[in-house]
């Protein structure tokens, strides 16, 4: 799936996955300089990288340390093996990480990871080092929301956009406006009239240029607009009827800068940084306020808390699933009596503290350990949410609404597509649990053995 096909919420999910991936890769350390990082751009040929790796394999034979030589050659072999699984590169290129790393328990572990990124890979790289290089993954985290800038003063105007860390100057022009006429006499009013007319025409040109550059198909092609300048022109433009109302509606900040042109543009970008980062928070606040409104109006079209939200998900009732991205909850798959006739599998979703208190690692007898698979619950949701027919919105706690959602509602909730009696679902689950408990007790209780 390419970046252009992703919705904003899907991009947020992909960024979340990349952040988790970066954490994992940056915590790994190689055995010597024996871990490999490979970046392949969309235009590259797999055959070219295969040739390079084969050459590097031969070069590695000159490494003096026998252990390091074997580790490097093993990583190269693993990289070649993974590349052979591709007939052609994915549309956005490929990232490949291979090598033997030390785990947190100081144990060796072989790692081979191929990543099809959701944004195009920007550069080619082959590097053998003692750590994985994640610069390209960090670039994937940059916002792809595009903001417009207009730097306007009495000497001219500059138009530009900013997308992530990429600045693009779209257009600029200079102007010579008449100064205030200091002399009196009959010509004073005439010069003032000419001056005002020239200023008006200048602002008209600025406004028309903004519409041409920042409006496409009758709608803004940017998510926000910053007006900057050293004089009053920016405020006059903002308040003018000449300024397109569609652009006026998305002005996120008006800032004073000391210089025109490129220098003023750089100043404007620095001064507007807080407003640009706040656009995502505004969207987040709007989403959560809608959720809170459902609760305040008691529409019964909402759920919150881990267990109730899971019940609604399994019932297919959730339209929009809202989850705090740093939710400290795990999904435990518990297997009892693996391989036996009475093998059973259970799934628990809880915190690590709850798992310890519930003692899910031990069977009821307390003598046999269960087989446990532990997975971050948000990771699991990010992978599986589509199976439940819902959209997934990942939120932070950087806004007041986000903090309230985490503290007051457990950091997870949903907007439902139809009303659901959650209390009735709880009662059904409780009844099923009671029946299972009674059945288990009946199996343990043998009348003939105990009373005959």
UniProtKB/Swiss-Prot annotation:
Query: From what superkingdom does this record's organism come?
Result: Eukaryota
User: What broad class describes the main subcellular location of this protein?
Assistant: cytoplasm
* Record Pfam families: eRF1_1 (PF03463), eRF1_2 (PF03464), eRF1_3 (PF03465)
A Gene Ontology BP annotation from the UniProt entry: post-transcriptional regulation of gene expression
Tell me the compartments it is located in. Cytoplasm
The protein's UniProt keywords, in alphabetical order, are: Cytoplasm, Protein biosynthesis
Q: Which terms does the record give in the GO molecular function aspect?
A: mRNA binding; translation release factor activity
A single GO cellular-component term from the record reads: cytoplasm
Answer whether the UniProt record assigns the keyword Thylakoid to this protein. no
Q: Which family does it belong to?
A: Belongs to the eukaryotic release factor 1 family.
General function of this protein: Directs the termination of nascent peptide synthesis (translation) in response to the termination codons UAA, UAG and UGA.
Question: Quaternary arrangement and interactors, per the entry?
Answer: Heterodimer of two subunits, one of which binds GTP.
- Name this polypeptide is given: Eukaryotic peptide chain release factor subunit 1
Q: Which organism is it from?
A: Trypanosoma brucei brucei
